[in-house]
């Protein structure tokens, strides 16, 4: 996740924050969004899930699919915001944007705070290590059985995985964004960085000081290999918008264009098929 901390709608976000100072946040409803012709969408600058390119254009699986959905809903304009991953949900709850297109993993604890669409993607885990993998680490479980330290991004669901694997807190290094992962691992502050396989691959391609751990073994939690399902995220009051997105998403996922978007960003055909294997209701259930 490469976080450039760049805000592309400063005026809009600032106005929202000022308006929130004295009154509770009230999410825009679908009818209002369609009337105004503007959908406010946030990403966390995580390649390939949702990010802004050097030209200021929204890219990634989430944004590309969101553009098709917005068009289908008759919404002519999307105003994009970038923020840290850990700020995505608070920003939704504060009405700084209407929707998040970051392929955020659908998890029970998140479902208590926000609404999710049905899954748009599925993806597995990976591990970023120093070049040559000097500590010979190939799984998350190793960090529970040694003195090695593992880094994670603040707000990411890898924390729950590591806790389930009994990795002590003293061995977990929290960083603010994916951009810091390369230096964190290459300088030895941590011996590995836990993230999705796609994120790890993207980071490894940016520096010859790190690499993706080969022969990585997916973490097994409660007897089940870990796989995540990502979707669009909404405030709890945005039921109509969520439902409308679900309707259009279901239609779009039946087209070859949808799968082409996923595979174009490095998802496998199996990842695309995997998005159909779970419902949001199942993923939100404890």
Annotate each predicted stretch with a short phrase.
Residues 157-172, 213, 246-286:
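Ligand-binding clefts/hinges and TM-proximal coupling segments of bilobed small-molecule sensing domains
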Residues 28-103, 112, 264:
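Extracytoplasmic small-molecule ligand-binding "clamshell" domains
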Residues 78-90, 135, 172-187:
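Short helix-initiation/N-cap motifs at beta->coil->alpha
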Residues 63-72, 133, 141, 156, ...:
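Extended ligand-binding regions for polar small-molecule ligands
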Residues 52-54, 66-76, 144, 156-176, ...:
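Ligand-binding cleft/hinge of the Venus flytrap
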């Amino acid at each position: 996740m490469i976080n450039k901390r760049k805000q592309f709608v400063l005026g809009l976000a600032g106005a929202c924050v000022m308006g929130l100072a004295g009154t509770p946040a009230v999410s825009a409803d679908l009818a209002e969004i369609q009337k105004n012709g503007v959908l406010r969408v946030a990403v966390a600058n995580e390649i390939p899930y949702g990010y802004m390119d050097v030209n200021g254009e929204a890219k990634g699986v989430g944004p590309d699919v969101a553009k098709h959905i917005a068009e289908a809903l008759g919404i002519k304009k999307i105003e994009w915001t970038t923020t840290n991953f850990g700020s995505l949900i608070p920003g939704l709850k504060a009405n700084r944007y209407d929707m998040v297109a970051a392929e955020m993993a659908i998890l029970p604890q998140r479902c208590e705070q926000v609404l999710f669409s049905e899954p748009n993607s599925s993806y597995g885990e990976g591990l970023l290590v120093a070049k040559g993998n000097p500590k010979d680490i190939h799984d998350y479980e190793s960090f529970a059985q040694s003195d090695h330290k593992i880094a994670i991004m603040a707000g990411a669901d890898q924390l729950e995985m590591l806790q389930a694997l009994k990795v002590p807190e003293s061995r977990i290094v929290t960083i603010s964004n994916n951009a810091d992962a390369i230096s964190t691992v290459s300088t030895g502050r941590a011996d590995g960085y836990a993230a999705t396989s796609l994120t790890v691959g993207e980071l490894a391609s940016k520096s010859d000081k790190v690499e993706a751990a080969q022969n990585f073994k997916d973490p097994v939690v409660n007897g089940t290999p870990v796989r995540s399902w990502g979707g669009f995220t909404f405030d709890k009051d945005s039921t109509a918008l969520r439902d409308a997105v679900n309707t259009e998403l279901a239609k779009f996922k039946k087209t070859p264009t949808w799968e082409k978007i996923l595979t174009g960003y490095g998802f496998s055909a199996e990842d695309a098929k995997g998005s159909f294997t779970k419902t949001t209701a199942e993923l939100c259930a404890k």
